[in-house]
């Protein structure tokens, strides 16, 4: 096997793609800052107990594990940054009020989450801690849609769900944990035969309501059907009210309600949202409320947030990241060096052609050039090549 090959679903990021990813990363982090979010940089690896705290079985399967040569304990390479940020909020910052945090960094997965999907996503996201009200969820939803807009993605569809609906139904009669897992999978895939089989032993009202959930999918009018057809439980009413409020604050995004899309049920504790764009089968961003994550660190706090994979978003973003640059000849002239240094100090990209090498027209858009006039070096428009 050639020694330059990389593991399956792992790839280098080449200059053109890296420029685009970095442009989007800067745009989004700058956007988060305008909302008051503070940047944190958690480590790439942690003790496995910390990485997997309060996250459920799925993240355990995704996490690379190895033995720490210093302590002998098992450590993991992070597969999700969200639990790390929850640890920072709960244990390190230890603030009493609202905390807004954001992050951007690579994560590693033992298996790809789908076809042609990298095992090294570049995860970027934002979290609010300390406010249990729907206002925090509304802000996160708004920020997620603004981040996708900053990436140039139009015609975004927002899918909304609320784990409180199923939680209220399951509270009516106990369901074994292993059956719950199968139940969630059947709901997510809308597998009606499997769902009927799994709920066969439940009380009739509970069984019928759970089997109804996959059909409660579509526009905002689904909420009215859900109110009419689901049991009149206070928790269900509150969940539907929350979804109606989120839908009303979706801006220009189309809204779908899907009361069976319960991926991450064990992790989330309230509203869940996912953003889709035309031509892409999977969600480009996901978020929701997860109030229980901080419990493992001794300090449960209300929490809500979203994240996305920058590499995936960059692959579908129309943003052009080919930077404008100034071309300069190679010369030992001190005045030229002074002119170049002055331009670079203002943020301009100035590239000198090395002797015998033409400028790289592919990687940069040379729209200007440094030319000598009367003993001075001045910036002039660059004439297009014939």
UniProtKB/Swiss-Prot annotation:
GO terms for molecular function: histidine-tRNA ligase activity. GO terms for biological process: histidyl-tRNA aminoacylation; L-histidine biosynthetic process. GO terms for cellular component: cytoplasm. The keyword Cytoplasm applies. Keywords: Amino-acid biosynthesis, Cytoplasm, Histidine biosynthesis. Pathway: Amino-acid biosynthesis; L-histidine biosynthesis; L-histidine from 5-phospho-alpha-D-ribose 1-diphosphate: step 1/9. It is found in: Cytoplasm. SUPFAM superfamilies: Class II aaRS and biotin synthetases. Gene3D superfamilies: Bira Bifunctional Protein, Domain 2. Belongs to the class-II aminoacyl-tRNA synthetase family. HisZ subfamily. NCBIfam families: hisZ_biosyn_reg, PRK12292.1-1, PRK12421.1. Heteromultimer composed of HisG and HisZ subunits. Required for the first step of histidine biosynthesis. May allow the feedback regulation of ATP phosphoribosyltransferase activity by histidine. This function is generally fulfilled by the C-terminal part of HisG, which is missing in some bacteria such as this one. This is ATP phosphoribosyltransferase regulatory subunit. It comes from Ralstonia nicotianae (strain ATCC BAA-1114 / GMI1000). The lineage of its organism: Bacteria, Pseudomonadati, Pseudomonadota, Betaproteobacteria, Burkholderiales.
